[in-house]
């Protein structure tokens, strides 16, 4: 069943580990599992996938805690002046993230790292087992929801949103993007999500610590998650020197596109998708996020740069130049060449054209 205690017991059995460290995450897990159980109308396959997903999150927490206890130096790793892309969904954040991440001096979390931030021992020259597992999950999603890929590219080895790291604290809106969980959503809206951002930072430190750095400067993190818009005050508390790139696009265009993506995501877990209810819920959330972002911007104007989706589409490298000037980074020939190669490999609509209209969602 989707019961918090049974999931915790399963994770302990699977890993052979007992210690979660700080267990304040339990409240969020309990509220979430109750909501999924009673409100989400999960079909049997959806319930099975959700159980595996939540157990996987708990397994990572157990393994991470073991490393934090053995290696306190992990939490001393510096995460300096990260670039943070925070704009509403469908505003060019993925394209911009992949472009910036292609600079060899930048460090972005890959999809397979988001699924499991902890590197396991494997023979030199062999494929990381995390990459294999994530490719398998990608294949399953392609089978269950082929249209999803035209909306949002999924690639095991490509940069991924760290919203998935916030999810390890059970204080993120990932659940709302996968299922109808109104009581969890209402509870989450009232929470201080600082513990999720602090845990996210510790996982970034863990990934950085695991990766043997070449001599010289450590890479600079480039992060990207639309949900940061609602919590920029907390993000700046945890990463005080963050440089925030806020992306913009006509909301009438993004609302339908994003509603379509969420509705397809829900369809993996349930046969009962109310597209209009999905759209109304996320429209309310997005309005709240933008209003919260504007309040934070008024207090920290120097931390932000604005980037238009239309300018990114027209001349992405010109926008990168402006971002780098803002962040005090030199745009080197090597970085420029890497970005041009990334652009050529990922043309718009590579995975198909995504068709939708506002009317489909009662907007």
Annotate the PLM regions:
Residues 86-88, 222-226, 309:
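Short His-Asn-centered micro-motif
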Residues 102-112:
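Post-Walker A helix-loop "phosphate-sensing" segment adjacent to the P-loop in P-loop NTPases
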